[in-house]
Protein backbone atom coordinates (compact mmCIF):
# COMPACT_ATOMS: atom_id res chain seq x y z
CA UNK A 1 0.00 0.00 0.00
CA UNK A 2 2.88 2.37 0.77
CA UNK A 3 4.34 1.97 -2.73
CA UNK A 4 0.94 2.66 -4.30
CA UNK A 5 0.55 5.82 -2.22
CA UNK A 6 4.11 6.89 -3.07
CA UNK A 7 3.50 6.43 -6.81
CA UNK A 8 0.30 8.44 -6.58
CA UNK A 9 1.88 11.19 -4.46
CA UNK A 10 4.97 11.57 -6.65
CA UNK A 11 3.08 11.71 -9.96
CA UNK A 12 0.31 13.95 -8.62
CA UNK A 13 2.95 16.30 -7.16
CA UNK A 14 4.93 16.31 -10.42
CA UNK A 15 1.79 17.24 -12.32
CA UNK A 16 0.88 20.04 -9.89
CA UNK A 17 4.46 21.38 -9.80
CA UNK A 18 4.89 21.47 -13.57
CA UNK A 19 1.54 23.22 -14.03
CA UNK A 20 2.39 25.72 -11.28
CA UNK A 21 5.69 26.55 -12.99
CA UNK A 22 4.00 26.99 -16.37
CA UNK A 23 1.32 29.30 -14.93
CA UNK A 24 3.86 31.30 -12.90
CA UNK A 25 6.57 31.76 -15.52
CA UNK A 26 4.99 31.36 -18.97
CA UNK A 27 2.19 33.71 -20.07
CA UNK A 28 -0.87 32.07 -21.60
CA UNK A 29 -0.23 31.39 -25.29
CA UNK A 30 3.55 31.70 -24.96
CA UNK A 31 5.98 28.96 -25.89
CA UNK A 32 9.55 27.90 -25.20
CA UNK A 33 11.27 25.76 -27.81
CA UNK A 34 13.22 22.94 -26.25
CA UNK A 35 14.11 20.98 -29.40
CA UNK A 36 13.25 23.21 -32.37
CA UNK A 37 9.70 22.60 -33.61
CA UNK A 38 9.73 19.05 -32.27
CA UNK A 39 9.37 19.70 -28.51
CA UNK A 40 8.03 22.91 -27.02
CA UNK A 41 6.53 24.08 -23.76
CA UNK A 42 3.37 25.96 -24.75
CA UNK A 43 1.00 27.37 -22.13
CA UNK A 44 -2.57 26.62 -23.21
CA UNK A 45 -5.85 26.07 -21.38
CA UNK A 46 -8.08 23.16 -22.27
CA UNK A 47 -11.77 23.24 -21.33
CA UNK A 48 -12.27 19.81 -22.92
CA UNK A 49 -11.04 16.31 -22.11
CA UNK A 50 -7.90 14.32 -22.86
CA UNK A 51 -6.09 15.60 -25.98
CA UNK A 52 -8.66 18.43 -26.30
CA UNK A 53 -11.48 16.06 -27.29
CA UNK A 54 -14.74 17.94 -26.70
CA UNK A 55 -17.59 16.11 -25.00
CA UNK A 56 -19.79 19.20 -25.18
CA UNK A 57 -19.78 22.62 -23.62
CA UNK A 58 -21.74 21.64 -20.50
CA UNK A 59 -20.33 18.15 -20.02
CA UNK A 60 -19.89 17.49 -16.27
CA UNK A 61 -16.14 16.81 -16.34
CA UNK A 62 -15.75 17.23 -12.57
CA UNK A 63 -18.54 14.76 -11.80
CA UNK A 64 -17.11 12.24 -14.26
CA UNK A 65 -13.67 12.77 -12.69
CA UNK A 66 -14.96 12.17 -9.17
CA UNK A 67 -16.69 8.98 -10.33
CA UNK A 68 -13.41 7.89 -11.97
CA UNK A 69 -11.48 8.64 -8.77
CA UNK A 70 -13.88 6.55 -6.65
CA UNK A 71 -13.73 3.72 -9.21
CA UNK A 72 -9.92 3.81 -9.34
CA UNK A 73 -9.62 3.76 -5.55
CA UNK A 74 -11.92 0.71 -5.49
CA UNK A 75 -9.74 -0.96 -8.15
CA UNK A 76 -6.58 -0.18 -6.17
CA UNK A 77 -8.03 -1.61 -2.96
CA UNK A 78 -9.30 -4.71 -4.77
CA UNK A 79 -5.91 -5.19 -6.47
CA UNK A 80 -4.10 -4.91 -3.14
CA UNK A 81 -6.54 -7.35 -1.54
CA UNK A 82 -5.95 -9.87 -4.33
CA UNK A 83 -2.20 -9.21 -4.15
CA UNK A 84 -2.03 -7.90 -7.72
CA UNK A 85 0.47 -5.16 -6.96
CA UNK A 86 1.22 -4.39 -10.61
CA UNK A 87 -2.43 -3.51 -11.25
CA UNK A 88 -2.57 -1.49 -8.02
CA UNK A 89 0.47 0.50 -9.17
CA UNK A 90 -0.99 1.08 -12.65
CA UNK A 91 -4.29 2.24 -11.19
CA UNK A 92 -2.32 4.62 -8.91
CA UNK A 93 -0.62 6.11 -11.99
CA UNK A 94 -4.00 6.63 -13.68
CA UNK A 95 -5.49 8.01 -10.45
CA UNK A 96 -2.69 10.59 -10.19
CA UNK A 97 -3.53 11.79 -13.69
CA UNK A 98 -7.27 11.98 -13.11
CA UNK A 99 -6.78 13.77 -9.78
CA UNK A 100 -4.32 16.24 -11.32
CA UNK A 101 -6.71 17.26 -14.07
CA UNK A 102 -9.69 17.41 -11.70
CA UNK A 103 -7.68 19.71 -9.42
CA UNK A 104 -7.22 22.03 -12.42
CA UNK A 105 -10.93 21.95 -13.24
CA UNK A 106 -11.85 22.81 -9.66
CA UNK A 107 -9.30 25.63 -9.45
CA UNK A 108 -9.28 27.03 -13.02
CA UNK A 109 -12.46 25.53 -14.58
CA UNK A 110 -10.18 24.13 -17.30
CA UNK A 111 -6.98 22.12 -17.55
CA UNK A 112 -3.48 23.57 -17.95
CA UNK A 113 -1.65 21.89 -20.84
CA UNK A 114 1.92 22.60 -21.89
CA UNK A 115 3.74 19.63 -23.48
CA UNK A 116 3.72 20.41 -27.20
CA UNK A 117 5.16 17.81 -29.59
CA UNK A 118 5.12 17.81 -33.38
CA UNK A 119 7.03 17.81 -36.61
CA UNK A 120 6.03 21.25 -37.91
CA UNK A 121 3.76 24.16 -36.97
CA UNK A 122 0.83 22.36 -38.62
CA UNK A 123 1.62 18.72 -37.81
CA UNK A 124 1.33 18.53 -34.02
CA UNK A 125 -0.10 16.27 -31.34
CA UNK A 126 -2.66 18.06 -29.11
CA UNK A 127 -0.88 19.86 -26.26
CA UNK A 128 -1.00 17.78 -23.07
CA UNK A 129 0.36 17.61 -19.52
CA UNK A 130 1.86 15.18 -17.00
CA UNK A 131 -1.61 14.09 -15.83
CA UNK A 132 -2.64 13.22 -19.40
CA UNK A 133 0.57 11.21 -19.74
CA UNK A 134 -0.18 9.29 -16.54
CA UNK A 135 -3.68 8.44 -17.75
CA UNK A 136 -2.55 7.45 -21.25
CA UNK A 137 0.51 5.43 -20.24
CA UNK A 138 -1.25 3.73 -17.33
CA UNK A 139 -4.23 2.73 -19.48
CA UNK A 140 -2.03 1.61 -22.38
CA UNK A 141 0.06 -0.68 -20.17
CA UNK A 142 -3.04 -2.05 -18.44
CA UNK A 143 -4.78 -2.84 -21.75
CA UNK A 144 -1.64 -4.48 -23.14
CA UNK A 145 -1.52 -6.68 -20.04
CA UNK A 146 -5.22 -7.58 -20.38
CA UNK A 147 -4.80 -8.42 -24.07
CA UNK A 148 -1.68 -10.47 -23.39
CA UNK A 149 -3.52 -12.45 -20.70
CA UNK A 150 -6.56 -12.91 -22.97
CA UNK A 151 -4.51 -14.29 -25.86
CA UNK A 152 -2.44 -16.49 -23.54
CA UNK A 153 -5.62 -18.09 -22.17
CA UNK A 154 -7.11 -18.39 -25.63
CA UNK A 155 -4.10 -20.25 -27.01
CA UNK A 156 -4.25 -22.94 -24.30
Placement of each model-derived feature along the sequence:
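Alpha-helical transmembrane bundles and membrane-interface segments of multipass inner-membrane proteins
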Residues: 1-156
Amino acid sequence: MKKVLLIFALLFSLDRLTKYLVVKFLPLGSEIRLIGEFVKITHVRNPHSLWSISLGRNFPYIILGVVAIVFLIALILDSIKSKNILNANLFAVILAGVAGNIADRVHFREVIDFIDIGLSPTLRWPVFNVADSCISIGLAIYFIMVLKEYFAKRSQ
